[in-house]
Regions:
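GST-like domain detector, emphasizing the conserved glutathione-binding G-site
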Residues: 2-4, 8, 26, 36, ...
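Basic polycationic patches enriched in arginine
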Residues: 28-31
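Conserved beta-strand edge residues that scaffold enzyme active sites
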Residues: 92-95, 242, 260
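Active-site-flanking alpha-helical
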Residues: 132, 224-225, 256
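GST-like fold's C-terminal all-alpha helical module
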Residues: 158, 162-250
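Acidic/histidine-enriched, glycine/proline-rich intrinsically disordered or flexible terminal extensions
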Residues: 259-273
């Protein structure tokens, strides 16, 4: 094979002289693969252009009644605040399992439930923590460590507390009860919620609970704002301004509009107190 390799090299100068005349044909043929490579590169960029729709198709949020379910509202607002595209799956409120959750008869609340890229997350606070990790630019938790701890604490308090208010002032966006009489235990819950709001707005400057950025806490307390409207709860100026601000958020307005057009009623909740 060494001899064959030397044979072309040891040829006379006449062979190379003819080679250049034929050589252009070969380079021209060689240009064809280069063109194909450019074409394939252009095709490779196409999936990037449709990446947002792919992301949306791999994220789904399961909720139930928009009129009655405060937990569904919290999970939905968190997902909207995060900026994560998602499809919405709505379970009918007359489904036995979801009905039990809305009526506070379920031992565990599994709605809302977020599925994102194969990861299934339920429980509103778990969804909030997950969204904060996958969508950090949304800043669902404050950057400052002390503010972040405070945000988690009051979100947890909303998550596990205020049972008297929940049971006596259930969420019902289509209803309105002027001069609704609030019993003492529910009033204690309302007083505590207002104290939380005032402390946060005074500490972090407002207009939201932790400053200029909406956080997990705002999503957690948004359904309370709707309850205060439904049951005609009187608030001080600071708390009323915060309620008005939250009810004016585009995402909250979208939710309320959808709730008003929701066909299903739950007789146990859709009554005059």
């Amino acid at each position: 094979m060494a001899t064959l390799a030397k044979t072309p090299a040891s040829s006379t100068n006449k062979a190379p002289a003819k080679a250049p005349a034929k050589a252009p044909a070969k380079p021209r043929a060689a240009r064809s693969p280069t063109t194909k490579a450019a074409t394939s590169t252009a095709k490779a960029k196409a999936p990037a252009a449709v990446a947002p729709s792919v992301s949306a198709s791999t994220s789904a949020l399961t909720i139930t009644s928009k009129n009655y379910s405060s937990w569904s509202m919290r999970g939905w607002l968190l997902t909207r605040f995060s900026g994560l595209p998602f499809t919405e799956n709505v379970l009918p409120p007359d489904d036995p399992s979801t009905r039990a959750e809305i009526l506070l008869l379920s031992s565990s609340i599994l709605v809302p439930c977020l599925v994102h890229n194969g990861v299934r997350v339920w429980d509103t606070l778990a969804i909030a923590e997950y969204l904060n990790e996958v969508c950090p630019d949304a800043q669902l938790l404050p950057a400052d460590v002390i503010a972040r701890a405070h945000c988690r604490a009051i979100s947890g308090e909303m998550h596990s507390g205020f049972s008297a208010m929940r049971s006596s002032l259930p969420m019902n966006l289509r209803a309105h009860f002027p001069k609704f009489k609030i019993w003492s235990r529910a009033q204690s819950d309302i007083d505590r919620i207002c104290a939380i709001w005032r402390e946060c707005i005074e500490t972090y400057g407002g207009p939201f609970l932790f400053g200029e950025q909406r956080t997990t806490a705002d999503a957690m307390y948004a359904p309370v704002c709707t309850r205060f409207i439904t049951y005609d709860v009187k608030l001080d100026k600071v708390c009323q301004a915060y309620c008005d601000l939250m009810l004016a958020q585009p995402e909250v307005k979208d939710w309320i509009e959808a709730a008003k057009s929701e066909p299903a009623d739950i007789d146990e909740l859709d009554v005059e107190f």
